[in-house]
Structure formats: C-alpha cells, structure tokens
Amino acid sequence: MTAEKSGSSRRSFLTSAAATSAYVWIPKPVNGYKAVEMRPASYDDRAKPGVSKWELDTPALCVDLDRMERNVAKMQATLKQSGLSSRPHAKTHKTAAIAKYQLSTGSIGICCAKLTEAEAMVGAGVDRICMTTANPSVAKIKRAMAIRKNHPDFIQVVDYEHNARDLNDAAKAAGIVADVVIDVAVGARSGIPAADAPALAQLIDKLPNLKLRGMLSYDGGVQHAKGFENRKTRALKTIEPNVAAYEAMKQSGLNMEIFSGGGSGTYNIMHLVPHFTDLQVGSYLFMDMQYLAIGSESGDTVFNDFAPSLTVITTVLNNRFPNQMTTDAGSKALTLNTPTAGVIGEPGMTYNAGSDEFGGIRWTSPPSKAYQIGDKLELIVPHCDPAVNEYNQIYGTRNDKVETVWDVTARGCSQ
C-alpha cells in the first residue's frame, strides 16, 4: 500500500468526525494493512523514527503531531484573544517533552496533580510547576518544599489551616519562602468552601515562610456537561461564590495575582468570569471519546473544537466468530472508561475493552472490509489521561510516519 493511499484514508477522520455516545462517525473507511504487507523487522527497528505507524508493535499509543500542534495553537490563540493564559495539566500527557513544548508555545506554567508527577517533571527539566493537589502528610510536604528550594517558580496549593502551618514549618526548615495558592472548592471534591477562604488567606499572609499568590477553582463536574449552553450556564453559576471570595480577599489587600481553574470543556467560557487569569486545560491536546460527546458551541452532537490526535493502533487476533472479532487492545491498553473506544473508519463497530488483554469488536452492519488476522485498526481512546498512563512511550507521527518517540516521564506517578 502506498503512503499516499494510507495518508488519504487515515487523515479523513478528522475533517468529518461526529460523535455519538458510543463511537465516532467517519464517512471514509480506513482500509488497514494486511499482515503480509508489514515490513519484516525487529521490534527495535519498528520503534525507530521514520517507520510507518502501521509497522509498530501493538498496542501502540500514537499522537499525530500536526493535529496536536494545531490543537495547541488554537488554544493559545483563543485564550490570548480573551485575555487569559494557559497553565495546562501534565496529568493528561505525563510526558516532559510535551510539557516543554507547551511552555515554549506560550503556556505560563504546568500543573501537576500528584507530588511524584511533579518530581518526575522537575527531574526531567520542566519548570514553572503548580501543584494542584494538597499534600497533607509531613513527608510529602518536605518533598514539595525540596522541589521549591531548587525551583523558585514552584507553587503549592493549600486548603486547610493546619496544612498551611505545616507548609510554613517545612519552608522555614528548608530556608525558603514558599509560594502557595488556596484551593477554593467548586463542588465537594477538594478545597475549602468559598466562604471560609478569606480567613485561610489571612492566616497564610501572616505566616513568615509562605507567600500567597492567589487561588485555584477547578470545576471538574462541569467539563463534560452535555451541550455548550448548559455547560456555560453551570460553569458561570457554580463559580459565583468563588468570585465573591476572590473579591473579598483582594479588597482586604491580599496578593491575588492568580485566579486559575477551568478546563478544556470550558476554555471558551471562563473569560466571562471576573478576575480569572488562566486555565488548567489538559485534554484539548489529545481529545478522546468522552470529550467528543459533549457538544460544542456550533452544535450539541460533537465537540469539534479540537481534533482527536491521540490514538491506539491495535491488531486483529481472531475473526472466527460471526459479526465480531478480537484484538490485542484490552483494558490495559485503553482503560474501562465510557464511552468506549471509537473505531476509526468503522461507524458500525462497537468496541469493548472489558477483558484485560483483549478487545472485543462487534457490528450490526457490514464493516468496510473483511478483516483478517494481523490486520490493524486505529482507535480513539475513551479517556486520554488514564490511557496515556498505560504506556511507556508515545509515538509522535507525521503523515503516518514515526517522527519521534517520547518516554512517558511520569507513568505510574499516582502518589
């Protein structure tokens, strides 16, 4: 199969995709490669830059670099136009090379959800990290302050009075003044209630080894709300108490230079929030089936603001049984999130990754071709964050050829 044939069939899914709750509709089929068409090569050869992504051993996690770069450029342009900045979450890609790319293209910092993730990122040369999860244990606080001692632009979130005092003690022991932001709750997952935030801010302002920088308010519950107008109404309503808390702290003379939050689902909404400074976007980089299903400002059917750039290549293992086949991408390759993975080019197929090692595909209408053992398919992942965490490498491709291979720097860093 020629590169031209391969490229035209596989690139078509971006321009025409529309999502349902289970899969993405793509009018032009992806014909795939037969096993006999694969270039004989060792695994090491297949992993090198320059080979076709269809020659990679599977399951293989791939990102189309052109699409990813366009996603980043669109996010940066949109936020710049609305007067906001991006502070993207590393928990999406867990990859130092991508974090550095985001910083080089205009992001003001990188968010980390877990301390080990932050340690992996700084160890790989990523700076300007904001730790968005409070570290309640003394051991973790000491480690966070160790990062701050060597990286003056490190910011730690705090949401309890005793946590602030512990941070102050650890910062004093390390001989530093640590930058902190307050996690002001939106919902009931984490953070301090908005009404109580000013008192915590006043305490922090009095602690000699802490410097208050502002507040975070991330509303995770609204990011996947179906329909743009519904999402907009909910996002603006739920953050009203937080805006009031921000204004109370600002009026009392406290330093409130940061008002951060939001996400990929509300990237074009948060500019309407008074005093907001930056967005903690993540999935915009890759997209996934969950986000494709939420709808956009142009219509509730599909979230087409950003292109799906992250895919998993999988191989057919069994085709003996009617209207179904088995592949090598199970829950360890895709996770168990819903909606399930979308089979690119095959709108009649539904994918079930319920088995650890195997994926099951069923269909009620004929596929675009009769798939044989060794044929490969391309999948849009259900949820990009946990899917990335299943892999050691991401293959960066351009025009269906591997251009770069990135180590997933913070894979497994969940502590």
Please report, for each region that a protein language model flagged, where it lies by residue.
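N-terminal secretory signal peptides and thylakoid transit peptides that target proteins
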Residues: 2-21
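Active-site loop/helix belt of alpha/beta enzymes
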Residues: 5, 172-177, 185-296
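C-terminal segment of N-terminal export signals and the immediately downstream linker at the start
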Residues: 25-74, 78
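Glycine-rich tight-turn/loop motif centered on a GG-T
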Residues: 53-64, 128-131, 145-156, 226-236, ...
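N-terminal capping/small domains of soluble enzymes
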Residues: 55, 60-64, 69-81, 93-105, ...
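Conserved, mostly hydrophobic/aromatic
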Residues: 68, 91, 121, 182, ...
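Active-site-proximal beta-alpha core segment in soluble small-molecule metabolic enzymes
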Residues: 89-224
